[in-house]
């Protein structure tokens, strides 16, 4: 393998400010979407997951190697 010097990545204050601004915008849009969806989720009944009865119970490691009989 060729030995290379590590790549140097410089981070400017402008980059940090831009990141913080984008993060705020995304969190605000996410909160707005959640608030818009909230009334619809309250009116719908809860749906419970279906039980999967077609698969046999999983064996533990001890059962697989024959330690637990």
UniProtKB/Swiss-Prot annotation:
Could you mention a single GO BP entry for this protein?
A: anaphase-promoting complex-dependent catabolic process
Location of the protein in the cell: Nucleus
Q: What does this protein do?
A: Component of the anaphase promoting complex/cyclosome (APC/C), a cell cycle-regulated E3 ubiquitin-protein ligase complex that controls progression through mitosis and the G1 phase of the cell cycle.
Gene Ontology cellular component list: anaphase-promoting complex
Q: Give any Pfam family that matches.
A: ANAPC_CDC26
Instruction: Name the chain's protein.
Output: Anaphase-promoting complex subunit cdc26
Functional pathway:
Protein modification; protein ubiquitination
Subunit organization: The APC/C is composed of at least 13 subunits that stay tightly associated throughout the cell cycle: anapc1, anapc2, anapc3, anapc4, anapc5, anapc6, anapc7, anapc8, anapc10, anapc11, cdc20, cdc26 and cdh1.
Q: Where is this region: Disordered?
A: 23-69
Kindly state which keywords UniProt assigns to this record, in alphabetical order. Answer: Cell cycle, Cell division, Coiled coil, Mitosis, Nucleus, Ubl conjugation pathway
The species this protein was found in: Dictyostelium discoideum (Social amoeba)
Family, as annotated: Belongs to the CDC26 family.
Taxonomy, superkingdom = Eukaryota
Coiled-coil residues are: 8-38
Question: Polar residues compositional bias: what residue ranges?
Answer: 39-63
């Amino acid at each position: 393998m060729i030995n290379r010097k590590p790549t140097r990545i410089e981070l400017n204050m402008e980059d940090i400010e831009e990141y913080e601004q984008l993060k705020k915008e995304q969190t605000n849009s996410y909160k707005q979407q959640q608030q818009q969806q909230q009334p619809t989720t309250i009116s719908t009944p809860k749906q419970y997951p279906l039980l999967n009865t077609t698969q046999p119970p999983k064996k533990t490691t001890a059962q697989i190697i024959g330690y637990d009989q």
